[in-house]
Amino acid sequence: MNTILKTVIISFILVSPGMASASFISPETAWHRMADRSNKVYSFKNGVPKLEYTLSKAGVPTLYLFNSDGHTFCVSADDEVPALLGYADKTYSMRDVSPAFEAWLNTMAEEIGRVREGSASRNEMETRSNDFASIAPLCKTQWNQDAPYNNVCPKPKGETQRAYTGCVATAMAQVMKYHNWPLTGEGEISYNWNNLTLHEDFSTTSFDWKNMLDIYTEGEYSEEEGIAVARLMRSCGIGVEMSYSTSGSGALSQLIGGALGKYFKYDKSRLRYLMRDFFSLDEWEEMIYGSLQNDGPVILDGQSNQGGHSFVCDGYDKDGYFHINWGWGGTSDGYYLLSVLDPYNQGIGGSGDNSGFNYMQDAIIGIVPAKDDNSNNSWIGQLYSMGPLDIDTSVNYTPGEVIGPFCNDGIYNFGPAALPVNTELGLLFSNEVTGEKYIDYGVFEEGCGVMYGFSGVSLPVPMGITDGTYRVTLSYRAPQEDADEADEPRLDSEGWLDVYFPIGETASYTANVSEGIVTVEDSSWRPSGVEETYLLPADDSPRYFNLQGIEIKAPRKGELVIQKRGKEVKKIFI
């Protein structure tokens, strides 16, 4: 132990001679601090740990990896953060770990670095303590991305080697194997990759679950068993339009939920895509745990400065330690903190050199087989704003007057499904005393696909709103069958969904309505719904008007206008 410690300290002095004033603790101190504070390693604290790896930031240690008595422990090198960051029930070397696990280590190092720099405080990094019951790891599989998993993946032109499955496909496949679902898929897809057209008719694809092994060891599985898992992996990859490569295949995590619902018969009404930066740490852990408990394994994804990685969260110990299956043949699978910091207050569009899974981390929850006709389940994407709601509070408004443009940083649909044609978007006014809700909305004439968005929104104060104090939020909902029939204000609070805003950004306002004057004040909280529309006289030719009835010759992109096309009159976003 002393020899290891001397080697580490000498190497740091050579790299960073001015580090004497830096805040860090030695490997020996870090190990004993962790052993004293964590009952998870109580039985091992008298053993002789081996320092496997040290990760530094700016030449100063941030965390240590120890192997001891057949276990691995990730331990903080700073006494201002939780002592134990993660642990696994077997030892491993950094030479063998997955890129996803390596990126998680970098995340922890970045967050510890922010504490040292003063941009995060100790109380933000306390180990979580909650009443969640333990959930043993749900996935028995220890799958990877190479043979036999990629045995039917495409071969890039001019190469003899098959492309890797991709971490997205491996994560999807392991969750689907847990459910042993579906027996056959539905729908079909074609897309271009590397000057080739990749196609699959999922309705003719059957999945041979009984012949898929939990662990594949070379020379210990049959051809039938190898093909069974390889075909599943290929179907998952094609379903998310995988960009295949022999150096590493990739796909957008935002497409996972859509593929599961559209091609693999998972319950569309349960699937949700969540972004980490829009929720507190408590909210995030509660949603992940709730899905684990009620639906099964969750797919997590994180963006680091080295790219994105998808992996499976399939269990829970306690105090915030979730079981992670990294999709690397079982290597480094274990219990880890999802994060030790709440999301950065600067939001997604903020500046700075932020890196790690706490930045642009996301999750696909509610992965459960459809128990009925999946085509009839509700199916709508989630809108995320990349910045604040940003309503001008320096002026007063009147009912019918347009507020905006706001949300100039953009609002995007991150799935799992496209927003249908005529999806409604409006400012929802909810009376804080009576609960009455008013909303005037526009519609998306062409819908909004996954990964598409808009900015510079302008929307009116609802007509007919009564005096009182209201909460104002930006809300949307699926098209309503009777939307064109309403020509009078009506209270209708069904089906409205929140547009999500990053933690730390203004997401809502307080509006005081008195004798027809609306005063808006900055006051963040979350939303609810209603609607009201009014129609202008029909015209025989397509024309555009603003919400005050003045004709517009050249509407601006993102502007809410009234379109008259023959006898049809509706509000739309250009």
Which residues fall in each region the model found?
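Aromatic sugar-binding surface patches on proteins
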Residues: 445-460
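Residue-level detector of functionally pivotal "anchor" positions at catalytic/ligand-binding pockets or at interdomain
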Residues: 361-387, 523-550
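Active-site-adjacent substructure of cysteine-protease-like catalytic cores
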Residues: 47-69, 258, 262-325, 333
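Cys-His-centered catalytic/binding microenvironment captured across papain-like cysteine peptidases
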Residues: 23-59, 73-74, 79-141, 293, ...
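Surface-exposed, short loops/turns at beta-strand junctions within beta-sandwich domains
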Residues: 460-469, 554-557
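Short beta-strand elements
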Residues: 480-527
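C-terminal outer-membrane/trafficking sorting elements
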Residues: 18-19, 527-574
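Active-site-adjacent structural segments surrounding the nucleophilic cysteine of cysteine proteases
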Residues: 81-249
